[in-house]
Amino acid sequence: MPRIFFSCPLMAFAVFLMSINLGQARSFNNDFETGDLTDWKMDDTENNAFEFQPTWGDNPTARNRGQPSKHQGDWWIGTYEKYQGPIKGKKLKQKPGGTQGDGPQGQITSIKFTIVGATMNFLIGGGNHPWKDEPMPCCGNLKIDGKVVLTATGNATETMTREEWDVAKYKGKTAQIEVLDKHSGGWGHPNFDDIHQADARGKNIPWDRILTVDARGKLAATWAQMKKYY
């Protein structure tokens, strides 16, 4: 029987390809469609605003608010809301249209990922309490090296609209998204959903192809794989 020999370079290349394929299987819960806060870390604020997040469905419409959420999919962040759907919500004795109000505070921070796109876009609504202008903000922030470099707020309506950040100058940097609810007064809540990176043509880049850092801190792909987006 003939023997088959594998050279060290060939074996190394095979392992490299396997690592890419395994990495590509790792995506990011950018739209909260897991129905929980997978890939996001909640801070230790007592009575945390994000304890019953994400919320399910158009909960503002369920309570006749007159301001549809216009969320993507089924799940989204809305810290005024307290309804987690027909399965989990029912177990917790929650009802459609249920709320927790503006009182609770807290924040969530995403896993780390690498900026590879020209822009980032996302849905945001809720309160208009900016990061820099108020001591108690309700907003979404982009953080690089632990510092806020871009921020956005809602416009005092439950209805979310798609906003965009220019992130071209941050390409190659490791970043995180944080959603803050630090306000307990009027419109003291953020609504947030469906965040993406997009290339220079405005086409969203699949998260499983981005240089994300997974929960174990390993790079999920190689820089060479992203060249087509530049």
PLM ranges: what are they?
Residues 104, 183-207, 220:
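Extracellular carbohydrate recognition
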Residues 139-175, 180-190:
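Extracellular carbohydrate recognition and processing domains
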